[in-house]
Each structure stands twice: as structure tokens, then as C-alpha cells.
Amino acid sequence: LLEKTDINLSPDFKNIDPANLRVKGDPKGEYCLPYAWGTTGIFYNEKVTGPITGWADFLAIPEKTGGKITMLDDMREVMAVGLIMTGKSVNSTDPAELQAATDYLLEHKAGVSAFTYDVAPLITSGDIAAAQFFVGLNVLTKPIDGLKYVIPAEGGTMYQEAICVLASSPNKENAKKFMEFYLRPEIAAL
């Protein structure tokens, strides 16, 4: 499926933090180039919600303040909240643990206004008070007094993005050149 690019042999690969070589199927970076990572947490308008430290505070917003909240339209991220709040691993595959997480989420479903990725306009307009979202939202929105981001005290998720080349790609050499372009320090800094 993936082409072995040997991107790890490029001179600028030395700038990749070894901690970012986390993919079990590519521990040396022979296939893919890790280029970004982030967290999933809670964006909130502190002027509406008051301080938020975690998922329990987030899920209590509708009842406590009347403010609206949204969660991601992403089964894995939403289930992660249920698993965290029931004390289980976000990577659990145990049917009983998944059911307990589902039950927890269903208990709080009525307070969730929408499951969406379209958070930026909702939070900047004040239509919602808080949202489960990726940390990158802070670069998508205009500065708003009171807008905060927190990684929940109970726990959150982390993601990593990588550039890979398909084995069936017709332009493998250009794809590798693009990966090497991303490795340039002045480009990576952007």
C-alpha cells in the first residue's frame, strides 16, 4: 500500500524528534514523514462558562449556564471522552467498557447541541459556549477575549499527522521531493 521512501535518510530528517516516530509499522521513518501533532481538548468562552478544567465541567455547561456545547462528528474522539470518563483506555476494544462509555455519553447527549467539525464560526459568533475540538482551532479563529483551550484534567487524546506516498503513485520522485521540502527547517517552522 505504501511506498518505502527512505525519507529517514534525508539529511534534514535529523531534525525530526525521535519521540514523533511512534507508528508501530514505521518506527524508523522509512515510509512516512511525521510533520504535525496536536491534542483534542475543549475550547470555551470563559466569560460564558467560567473556568473549565475538564470533561465533567464541559458536559455540565448546558445545565449549569444554559450555554450550548458541541462535540466532534468523530466517533473515535467522542467515544474517547466516554472511555476517559469511565476510567478506561481510549484504545479499549472491550465490549463491556465500550458499552459503559456509550451509556455515559448517552446520559449527556441531550446537552450536546451538535456533533460537528464546523466549530470556528459557531464559537466566534457566540452561538456556542464551548466545543470539543483540535488545538489548531486557535489559528482558525480571530482573537476573542475570553476564548480559552484546555486539555481536560481527566485526559484527552493526541494525534499525529504524517505524509506518506502510495505504492501506486505515478510520481514517487516528486512526492519524495515534496517530503524533503517539508523537512527544510525554514519550511517546518511555518
Name every feature range the model reports, one short phrase each.
Residues G38, L98-L106, P143-S169:
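Periplasmic-binding protein-like
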Residues T39-T40, K47-G50, M75-V78, G136-V139, ...:
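Solvent-exposed loop/turn segments at secondary-structure junctions
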Residues T39-V48, I84-K88, Y159-N174, M179-Y182, ...:
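A bilobed periplasmic-binding-protein/Venus flytrap-type ligand-binding module shared by bacterial periplasmic
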Residues G67-M71, P185-L190:
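Bilobed periplasmic-binding protein-like "clamshell/Venus-flytrap" ligand-binding domains
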Residues L72, A131-F134, V150-P152:
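Short, conserved beta-strand edge motifs with alternating hydrophobic and charged residues
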Residues T124, A130-G146:
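A ligand-binding cleft/hinge motif common to bilobed small-molecule-binding domains
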